[in-house]
């Protein structure tokens, strides 16, 4: 996979770390609370084996319309804005569902139950599957062994709601 700047990254570099994977979008109603709270979470675990990986996605109401080279400026100057710098590793725009979904998300979705019980409209992909990610800022927590541990609904933005699970995985 590639970082937002085009640099290739091997997931081997995250071996032995607890990883939080999030599909992100700059122009979503959850953008400001999600980015600011994930920064608070990253700061809390700054000296531990914990990383957050963000994957911009335009499959939900087209709320990440920018080209890869423009996404960081949208975050810095629009939402959240004010020079905001996310404390997560940001990747290139990624398909998280459908015929062209990235294999990482195929793997994560197969290992963790969906957080939704119904589908919404304004989904821009096919085919639609029962375990699909259904909105921006859905999260997957992965243990140091690379095994998916749990999946969080996009409305879970408070870092306190994730800390027990993160602490469990860090101490494993």
From Swiss-Prot:
One family name in Pfam for this protein: GSHPx
PANTHER family per the UniProt record, alphabetical: GLUTATHIONE PEROXIDASE (PTHR11592:SF81)
UniProt key word Chaperone: no
Gene3D superfamilies reported in the protein's UniProt record: Glutaredoxin
Organism whose genome encodes this protein: Procambarus clarkii (Red swamp crayfish)
Alphabetical GO biological process terms: response to oxidative stress
Entry annotation: catalytic residues: 28
Tissue-specificity statement: Expressed at high levels in the ovary and at lower levels in the gill and hepatopancreas. Not detected in heart, brain, thoracic ganglia, gut, muscle, epidermis or testis.
Role, per record: Protects cells and enzymes from oxidative damage, by catalyzing the reduction of hydrogen peroxide, lipid peroxides and organic hydroperoxide, by glutathione. May defend against reactive oxygen species that accumulate during the immune response.
Keywords (A to Z) from UniProt: Oxidoreductase, Peroxidase, Selenocysteine
Induction context: Up-regulated in hepatopancreas following bacterial or viral infection.
UniProt-listed Enzyme Commission number(s): 1.11.1.9
Protein name as it appears in the record: Glutathione peroxidase
UniProt keyword annotation of DNA repair present: no
A GO MF label: glutathione peroxidase activity
InterPro entries, sorted: Glutathione_peroxidase, GPX_AS, GPX_CS, Thioredoxin-like_sf
